[in-house]
Amino acid sequence: MKLDLKILDARMRDYMPAYATTGSAGLDLRACLDAPVTLQPGETTLVPTGLAIHLADPGYAALILPRSGLGHKHGIVLGNLVGLIDSDYQGQLMVSTWNRGQTEFVLNPFERLAQLVIVPVVQAQFNIVDDFAQSDRGEGGFGSTGRH
């Protein structure tokens, strides 16, 4: 799949989104910062990437997801948990960054911060019904299928 990418900050030419391995699902996104940013515990900030994409095809969307190492080791996750980039969005990719950890975290310029995953999208149409066809699960949820 070819994707239109606009470089909004010339410095990002040296830090293009890339797959870390041939098996990677996510492209690494980096913090386009002029100076380090310190996040105190519980603090959130919006971090620019210096990049914009245009998917154009409504059959696709992009997800901005946290990097597992930052979340596990430092408590750095996305403030909105998942960022959804619609196919018609053309603005800068921004990463809502939340320090849910117990200690301050310093985010350095051009540090890998999040990952971008391209996913297929189905735009559903609704069929209004009075009742659903019976299923084994029915309305059971929140652990109704068992613990193990």
Curated annotation (Swiss-Prot):
Q: Which GO terms describe its molecular function?
A: dUTP diphosphatase activity; magnesium ion binding
Described by its record, this protein's role is as follows:
This enzyme is involved in nucleotide metabolism: it produces dUMP, the immediate precursor of thymidine nucleotides and it decreases the intracellular concentration of dUTP so that uracil cannot be incorporated into DNA.
Q: EC number(s) on record? A: 3.6.1.23
Q: Which family does it belong to?
A: Belongs to the dUTPase family.
- An example Pfam family from this entry, by short name, is dUTPase
Catalytic reaction annotation: dUTP + H2O = dUMP + diphosphate + H(+)
Q: What is this protein called?
A: Deoxyuridine 5'-triphosphate nucleotidohydrolase
